[in-house]
């Protein structure tokens, strides 16, 4: 119901003065103009701001969008952007990649925890408080220097650039504050910031973080990749990632073009939490079946196969064939022969599971942003899994799938968010369901 006490907005051409009401999705907040919902970028709840509406905005539109051009009454969570180029367009910004750059680090945690809780309530039909963890080192770094992968596009002058939000315009950049210092060192050494690229070409840097004495110095020297339009320009096509979980170090061979958790600490944090949840459900059972769905290059597969029961049998399923080849290589390197690693659509693969793997004790799934969807959730339930560990990169998809799993008789036993995307609205969530 509209708030009758809400002050009527003051409008000037395509701008309006509004009071921001609450958090919304995609790093935006909600306000109202003439009774219509407006999703506002670079705002915070309770602020009084001047907003410029995006064009076109028609009277018949269900909602409008806009961006802060002036802050009249700031929130205590507002800060000066640490990366001004990613801030509001009216304040010299406009490139994407850091839509919460105007929010303090504690404010970002609050924003994300509330967003996950609200989505779980609205779409998952369950009220739950969601604790959120910051990654080690992020507070000291001010939320910067965490990305081990970055992507850019060459502008008309061949310089690395990022697109200005909502346009095809390219803004040349000569650094990327969210990137790790290791990545920035590689970019400087390989003369990336000096340009010379074909206009319009896609530029990708993938640079695993060194892992101390474990990394061989000679091998580490070329453990990076500079790719242009998918082709290797410098470094190595196959990269080595090392992840230490509960004292055990795992080596992963990962294609430079493939997916890997982008935050330097995310594989350790997520891997440790997932393994601990699974072991808590198996309770040291010597014989168990585990499914690892949407398994990528095997981030969870390797520790699941080695750190659970002695006779654990596993099925891993991933749609990207290159990632599956990487996972199979990683498994062979550790002599893990009891994992059936398959490439293919998850739902179709689950229709034809071998009998000895058909009844999982625990299912671990890490689906893409769209989520697992109802069919896969129901297939998991039909297989008789007593525990489900769901890793989600989108709280909306998690909430929808939560409703399906609860409808199949599961109960949400544990949920925790991980801030592995500082300065952005993105958040990773891990949920445990049992029945």
From Swiss-Prot:
Its EC number is 2.1.1.-. The keyword Chloroplast does not apply. Keywords: Methyltransferase, S-adenosyl-L-methionine, Transferase. The active site is at residue 393. GO terms for molecular function: rRNA (uridine-C5-)-methyltransferase activity. S-adenosyl-L-methionine binds at residues 261, 294, 318, 366. Pfam families: TRAM, tRNA_U5-meth_tr. Transmembrane segments: none annotated. GO terms for biological process: rRNA base methylation. PROSITE patterns: SAM_MT_RNA_M5U, TRMA_1. PANTHER family: RNA M5U METHYLTRANSFERASE (PTHR11061), TRNA (URACIL(54)-C(5))-METHYLTRANSFERASE (PTHR11061:SF30). Belongs to the class I-like SAM-binding methyltransferase superfamily. RNA M5U methyltransferase family. This is Uncharacterized RNA methyltransferase BL1394. It comes from Bifidobacterium longum (strain NCC 2705). The lineage of its organism: Bacteria, Bacillati, Actinomycetota, Actinomycetes, Bifidobacteriales.
């Amino acid at each position: 119901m509209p708030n009758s006490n809400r002050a009527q907005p003051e409008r000037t051409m395509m701008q309006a003065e509004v009071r921001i009401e609450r958090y919304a999705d995609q790093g935006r907040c909600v306000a109202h103009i003439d009774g219509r919902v407006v999703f506002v970028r670079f705002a915070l709840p309770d602020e009084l701001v001047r907003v410029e509406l995006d064009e076109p905005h028609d009277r018949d539109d269900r909602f409008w969008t806009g961006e802060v051009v002036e802050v009249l009454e700031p929130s205590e969570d507002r800060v000066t952007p640490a990366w001004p180029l990613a801030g509001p367009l009216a304040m010299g910004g406009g490139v994407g990649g850091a839509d919460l750059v105007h929010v303090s680090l504690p404010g970002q945690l609050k924003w994300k925890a509330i967003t996950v809780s609200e989505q779980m309530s609205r779409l998952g039909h369950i009220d739950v408080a969601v604790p959120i963890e910051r990654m080690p080192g992020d507070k000291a770094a001010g939320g910067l220097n965490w990305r081990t992968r970055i992507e850019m596009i060459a502008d008309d002058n061949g310089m690395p650039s990022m697109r200005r939000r909502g346009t095809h315009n390219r803004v040349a950049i000569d650094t990327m504050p969210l990137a790790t210092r290791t990545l920035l060192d590689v970019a400087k050494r390989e003369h990336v910031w000096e340009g010379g690229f074909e206009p319009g070409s896609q530029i990708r840097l993938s640079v695993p973080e060194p892992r101390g004495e474990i990394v061989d110095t000679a091998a580490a020297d070329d453990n990076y990749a500079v790719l242009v339009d998918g082709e290797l320009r410098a470094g190595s096509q196959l990269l080595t990632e090392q992840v230490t979980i509960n004292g055990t170090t795992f080596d992963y061979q990962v294609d430079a073009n493939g997916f890997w958790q982008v935050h330097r600490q995310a594989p350790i944090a997520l891997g440790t939490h997932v393994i601990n949840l699974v072991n808590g459900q198996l309770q040291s059972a010597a014989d168990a079946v585990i499914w690892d769905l949407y398994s990528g290059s095997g981030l969870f597969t390797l520790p699941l196969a080695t750190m659970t029961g002695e006779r654990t049998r596993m099925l891993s399923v991933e749609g990207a064939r290159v990632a599956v080849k990487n996972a199979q290589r990683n498994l062979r390197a550790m002599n893990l022969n009891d994992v059936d690693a398959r490439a293919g659509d998850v739902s179709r693969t689950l229709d034809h599971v071998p009998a000895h793997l058909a009844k999982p004790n625990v299912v671990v799934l890490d689906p893409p942003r769209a989520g697992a969807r109802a069919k896969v959730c129901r297939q998991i339930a039909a297989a008789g899994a007593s525990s489900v560990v769901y890793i989600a990169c989108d709280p909306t998809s998690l909430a929808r799938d939560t409703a399906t799993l609860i409808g199949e008789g599961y109960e949400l036993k544990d949920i925790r968010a991980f801030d592995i995307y500082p300065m952005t609205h993105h958040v990773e969530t891990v949920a445990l369901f049992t029945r």
